[in-house]
Regions:
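Functional transmembrane alpha-helices
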Residues: 143-144, 148-153
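Membrane-helix and juxtamembrane interface regions of eukaryotic multi-pass membrane proteins
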Residues: 1-144, 158-244, 253-257, 274-275
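Arg/Lys-rich low-complexity patches in intrinsically disordered regions that function as generic
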Residues: 266-274
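Short hydrophobic transmembrane-like helices used for membrane targeting/insertion
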Residues: 254, 262-267
């Protein structure tokens, strides 16, 4: 049944993976796009932020708009015609998420953590082609989490560890944006999943348990990264116990030790030579 439900989407998943890979190649061709920031080539930041700013919000909003902004959309499943026009935006959102995960698998083939994280995330996306309810809630919840990832990309580019060409004011604002944005993203994402589990067709089934394990493991990892960076930064600024921890020389080691987050661009030092 699961395989039968996914089979009609194979073409869309393949096309999204190809287009996502093409986006990598396009942005990689720009001047200075291979410059490494926090161990990550700039072009991967650009592609990630493109998806987070435009792709996911656009298709989630368009899917809801197609229903006339019907609140019932959040609790609906695929219905009788999952390949019909009524679910076109939901399909593309999932295709885009899968393609985004897939595009870097070969690049980071030697990074076990990356493979585990992205492999689980892609399996989760495929699972949602069979979800009996709450499809809209998942799309919006996933978009909310991606907006948190957007603030993470911004803080890596313009935060406390960025170069001397970035002003102290901009660095601080980036840290504030991340501290607030990621915290709100995690909280809203957790609340939305709690609502998701109460929908008819999900309540009392195995769905909330399986998906909840992945969802809250993800939020726990994101929260660890979030607090590992923001807590010492603001404690140091306010003269607390974290004094001296946030203001180091060179790159922060938080990213290297942090769990990967959903759709997060993660690059190991060993991957640099392949660029």
């Amino acid at each position: 049944m699961w395989v039968d439900a996914i089979r009609p989407h194979v073409g869309g998943l393949a096309a999204a993976s190809a287009l996502s890979g093409a986006a990598n190649l396009l942005f990689r061709s720009f001047p200075n796009s291979r410059k490494v920031v926090e161990g990550v080539p700039l072009y991967l930041f650009f592609v990630a932020m493109l998806f987070q700013l435009f792709v996911y919000p656009h298709f989630a909003w368009s899917a809801w708009k197609f229903t006339g902004y019907d609140d019932g959309w959040f609790s609906q499943g695929w219905g009788a015609d999952p390949m019909g026009a009524a679910k076109q935006h939901e399909r593309v959102w999932l295709y885009a998420m899968f393609g985004f995960m897939m595009k870097d698998m070969w690049i980071f083939r030697n990074d076990l953590l990356f493979f585990l994280h992205h492999g689980i995330a892609m399996a989760g996306v495929l699972t949602f082609f069979t979800v009996p309810a709450g499809l809209g809630q998942f799309l919006v919840g996933g978009t909310v989490l991606e907006m948190g990832n957007l603030t993470y990309n911004i803080v890596l580019l313009k935060g406390k560890d960025s170069g001397p060409n970035v002003s102290p004011t901009v660095k601080h604002l980036a840290e504030v944006l991340y501290a607030i944005g990621m915290g709100v993203s995690n909280y809203v994402g957790a609340r939305m999943f709690a609502t998701f589990t109460k929908y008819d067709g999900l309540k009392g089934t195995y769905w909330p348990w399986g998906l909840g394990l992945m969802w809250f493991a993800l939020i726990a990892g994101r929260s660890h990264v979030h607090l590992s960076r923001s807590w010492p930064y603001f404690a140091q600024r306010w003269g607390g116990k974290g004094k001296g921890k946030a203001k180091g020389k060179g790159k922060s080691n938080v990213r290297d030790n942090a769990p990967a987050t959903v759709a997060e661009v993660r690059v190991t030092r060993s991957a640099k030579s392949r660029r």
